[in-house]
């Protein structure tokens, strides 16, 4: 905590680039947001449409996907960046073929200095690798939202 600016500066000094400085740089739709739309058959497409209708004009739209079915929804939602989360290199390669230049592709999640070459060979536009900015082991923390169960009265 409190070191974000220094971490981003260190990436630049090391020859990397920071494509996002803060949450205000674009709309990022992640899995926890989609829980709120799980009643629809196309939650990613629905989220993209809602975000586009409410975001400032020209704001970048980024959506995190975990499967090829979700990639198809993101393509239909005409987002700017599709973030392939925790995909292996073979699935990432398939996803990149589906996207065919209709959005920038970023691979993220599970990328290490040991597997980054295999992921780069899949052909993404960007690779997000947290190993560049964290060296000390940290506790894994997450917030998981689950839909509220409706009573069957």
What are these model-predicted stretches?
Residues 86, 109, 131:
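Short secondary-structure boundary segments
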């Amino acid at each position: 905590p409190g070191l974000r600016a220094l971490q981003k500066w260190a990436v630049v000094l090391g020859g990397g680039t920071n494509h996002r400085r803060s949450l205000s740089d674009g709309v990022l739709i992640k899995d926890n947001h989609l829980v709120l739309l799980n009643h629809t058959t196309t939650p990613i497409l629905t989220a993209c449409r809602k975000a586009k209708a409410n975001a400032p004009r020209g704001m970048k739209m980024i959506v995190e996907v975990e499967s090829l079915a979700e990639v198809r929804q993101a393509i239909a939602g005409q987002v700017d960046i599709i973030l392939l989360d925790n995909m292996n290199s073979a699935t990432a390669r398939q996803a990149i073929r589906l996207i065919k230049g209709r959005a920038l592709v970023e691979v993220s999640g599970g990328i290490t200095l040991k597997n980054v070459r295999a992921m780069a060979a899949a052909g993404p536009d960007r690779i997000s690798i947290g190993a560049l900015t964290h060296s000390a082991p940290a506790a894994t923390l997450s917030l998981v939202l689950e839909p509220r169960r409706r009573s069957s009265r």
